[in-house]
Amino acid sequence: MASSSGPVLLDLYADWCISCKVMERFVFPEPEVARQLARFTLLRADVTANDAQDQALLKQFGLFGPPSLVFFSEDGREIDEFRVQGEVSADRLEAHLAQVLAL
């Protein structure tokens, strides 16, 4: 991963994932969450097909499936202690993003 001008957020999602849809419709658009998300370089990985390539990506990060959020520092190192797996509330994600941004 090339250097970025800020932290990177990799959002792994799937069209069949109900929790992904909840987060996309109700969590990410919340004003404070959206404000904090704007400070990240956002990458989205669509694992809808659940094919060999998708499985390899999930395996690479040790994830069981979407929704999953993986954070990276500006220099491309994963900040693995801040991973999010599964559906989270806007309040929880807002606090989580603030912690990552404070690093």
Where are each of the predicted segments found?
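Hydrophobic beta-strand anchors of alpha/beta hydrolase catalytic cores
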Residues: L9-L10, L42, L69
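Short active-site neighborhood of thiol/selenol oxidoreductases, capturing the structured segment around
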Residues: S3-C17
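Structural alpha/beta surface segment adjacent to cysteine/selenocysteine redox centers
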Residues: A52-G65
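Extracellular/periplasmic catalytic domains that process cell-envelope and extracellular macromolecules
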Residues: S3, R35-L37, G62-L63
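Non-catalytic, surface beta->alpha helical segment in thiol-disulfide oxidoreductase systems
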Residues: V27-P29, F64-L103
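Typically the conserved alpha-helix immediately C-terminal to a functionally engaged Cys/Sec
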Residues: S19-A38
